[in-house]
Amino acid sequence: MENSKPSFQDVLEFVRLFRRKNKLQREIQDVEKKIRDNQKRVLLLDNLSDYIKPGMSVEAIQGIIASMKSDYEDRVDDYIIKNAEISKERREISKKLKAMGELKVHEPKGEE
């Protein structure tokens, strides 16, 4: 029973550790994002080197780059639209859950 009521110092330590854990999780996510970004850059350069051949004109290379840029911009647009659709669905589910919770709270106890 000695540890049943945490001391103020225990609570402070818990909060400190919890905040540190959250900070480390954010740092992990940031590093993972940097890894993904750099892997994508490597892949982009690999793709570019597949298209560029010796003796190509500067204009041909610029055309390839413009085409790749357009493709990536289209993908970004598609992801923005997909993200908006997912966010809309998430908001709708949140509203439904909130409404269900409010109904449950206001129900008389005998009807359950």
UniProtKB/Swiss-Prot annotation:
Instruction: State what protein this is by name.
Output: Pole-localizer protein TmaR
Give a short account of what the protein does. Pole-localizer protein involved in the regulation of several cellular processes.
Keywords, ordered alphabetically: Coiled coil, Cytoplasm
Task: Tell where it localizes.
Answer: Cytoplasm
An example of a Gene Ontology cellular component annotation for this protein is:
cytosol
Stored InterPro entries: DUF496, UPF0265
Give the organism the record lists. Answer: Cronobacter sakazakii (strain ATCC BAA-894) (Enterobacter sakazakii)
Query: What taxonomic lineage is listed for the species of origin?
Result: Bacteria, Pseudomonadati, Pseudomonadota, Gammaproteobacteria, Enterobacterales
| Name of the coding gene | tmaR
Give the range the annotation lists for the signal sequence: none
